[in-house]
């Protein structure tokens, strides 16, 4: 297993923070309001409404997970990028697939629970197929052992997608294929991260996959919690299915 620690520099940080203060406050309040609504129907409504401004808002947060995950996949994938079929789980508006497309990958299937997000993903023209699915409630609507790469970015966290979905990601991946996952490292997500890493290690002990790399990133995104400031950390995990 390879473990890397990344300390990412943010260009023109001070000047941009001053310029974005009002926007950041608005985005922070929006996200905190979503965390308060635990009911599934409320969350769906939130994401459907947020979809139109999602990309602008996460840019204010310096949300870098989609790029970091795409770079991780592109660095270790040694096959034919144009022929590789990628399953983008919790795809949102398509940020991860957009980065992967710029890196030479061409074939994408997207899954998300929000029809509003899927509508915008559809407009990108990136995806050959898009499916609606409530992860953790519905079974992932894909055939087993069908994808060269499976990615899930931003949704493996407390109050979002349950840890058990990780086994479905493995099932969707071809033997020899890759699964790329991310999670946040802030205090509110520590219990979830511990549970997630326990599941990942258990599957490694079961010989289902092997660890390719785990990248700890110090500056993942700007903190929104009232008891945190600056940036929170995050982690990119890349595993290769063995059977």
Spans of features found by a protein language model:
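N-terminal auxiliary segments of SAM/dcSAM-dependent transferases
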Residues: 2-41
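Conserved alpha-helix/loop element of class I SAM-dependent methyltransferases that forms part
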Residues: 63-83
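Class I SAM-dependent methyltransferase SAM/SAH-binding core
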Residues: 84-139
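A short acidic, Gly/Pro-enriched loop at the edge of an enzyme's catalytic core
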Residues: 139-150
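Residues lining the SAM
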Residues: 152-153, 182
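A short glycine-rich, Lys/Arg-flanked "PGG" loop and its adjoining helix->strand segment in the class I
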Residues: 163-175
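Conserved class I S-adenosyl-L-methionine
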Residues: 178-206
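Class I S-adenosyl-L-methionine
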Residues: 205-243
């Amino acid at each position: 297993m390879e473990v890397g620690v990344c300390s990412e520099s943010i260009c023109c940080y001070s000047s941009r923070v001053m310029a974005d203060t009002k926007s950041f406050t608005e985005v922070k309040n929006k996200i905190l309001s979503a965390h308060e609504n635990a009911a599934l129907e409320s969350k769906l409504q939130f994401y459907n409404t947020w979809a139109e401004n999602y990309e602008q808002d996460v840019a204010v947060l310096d949300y870098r997970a989609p790029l970091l995950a795409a770079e991780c996949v592109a660095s270790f994938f040694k096959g034919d990028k144009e022929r590789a079929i990628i399953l983008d789980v919790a795809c949102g508006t398509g940020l991860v697939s957009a980065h992967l497309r710029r890196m030479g990958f061409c074939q994408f299937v997207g899954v998300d629970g929000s029809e509003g997000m899927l509508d915008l993903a559809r407009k990108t023209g990136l995806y050959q197929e898009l499916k609606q699915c409530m992860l953790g409630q519905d079974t992932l609507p894909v055939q087993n052992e069908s994808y060269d790469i499976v990615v899930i970015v931003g949704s493996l966290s407390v109050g979002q997608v349950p840890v058990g979905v990780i086994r479905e990601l493995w099932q969707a991946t071809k033997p020899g294929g890759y699964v790329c996952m991310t999670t946040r490292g802030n205090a509110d997500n520590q219990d979830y991260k511990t549970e997630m890493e326990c599941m990942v290690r258990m599957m490694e002990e079961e010989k289902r996959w092997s660890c390719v790399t785990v990248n700890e990133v110090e500056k993942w995104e700007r903190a929104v919690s009232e008891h945190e400031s600056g940036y929170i950390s995050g982690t990119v995990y890349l595993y290769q299915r063995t059977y």
